[in-house]
Amino acid sequence: MKRFRRLGLLLIPALALMVLASCAPKKIYIPVISKGFQHQFWQTVKAGAEAAAKQYGVTITFEGPPTEADIQPQVQMLVNDMAKNPSAIALAALDTNAVMDQLNQAIKRKIPIIGFDSGVPNAPAGAIYATAATNSYNAAGIAADHMYDALKDKITAATAAHPVTIVDFNQDATSQSVTDRGKGFRDEMIKKIEADGKHTADDIRVIGNPAFIAPDTPTKGKAITIDVQVPATPKDPDSAVSAQAILNRVKKDNIIGIFCSNEGTVKGILASTADGTALPKNYPGMAVIGFDAGKNQKAAIRAKYFMGAITQDPYNIGFQAVDLAYKAIKGQSVANVDTGAKWYDSTTMDQPDIARLLYD
């Protein structure tokens, strides 16, 4: 009897530990799935996500496919992460349709999903709790404003007999952020042209990739062409091929400006112009505006080969994605966060409020 009593006394602490362990809060795990790793932009997003994870004491993983053309590898990453029973997921989807099954599973399992960067457009209702992203449409509009101001004399002087072309160069026609930028640049440029009093929509035509041509987009004008170009794939070599094709017809089509809507298309132009050094010599007077940052783009802007660029705040995008995920896990109300965008050029890129946004 004493032996059983002694055994019982020994079991009590063990049972108590088991009860306490079962009552311990589940460790918060948030996988952060980006669109790729081919651009330094994503490394800066990662740094922001890791900072938020440290602040809240949560575990995250940060992963993405090799390039932004690799849709299926990203789908598999999401499948694998959902099998680990995450507390929430932060996702920048390459293709919402490709992850529709996983989004519906997340709804059933009550796993909050936070979109970031391009987010998860057209997701099922209730799947996405909030999104941390730049307002890409408005950001590209800033680029159009600066390009118009720089080229105003050439644009207002354009006629059917002496037309001009402005290229709207986009990495793909599927990503929400990229397509929003392409459309934002297109629309703001049209608005500025119509406001100059010299031209109407009847003088403008938008050509190129059909994803960027809306039913109300002017397509028949002969004085000013906005040419929307998209490479065969988002991979860097294809962006370079497309960039070279654009540059080959600068003289024939009287291309006076090129807007590159992300780091990928910027790389294409830089690869085709010896990091921009050939621009002033071979294409004098042509304005080039970029997007985001990166060592080579920054150098091209500092040297005035590029007019300037639009910078996002990739660190804040990553931080806010994890911040929103944590708050959603805790049952707090969350809402979309506009992480901001700013214009910079050789005269402003060293200002503290700009310099902190410009990654290498």
Feature roles, as predicted:
Residues 1-11:
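Bacterial N-terminal signal peptides that target proteins for export
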Residues 3, 24-360:
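A residue-level marker of the well-folded mature domains of exported/periplasmic proteins
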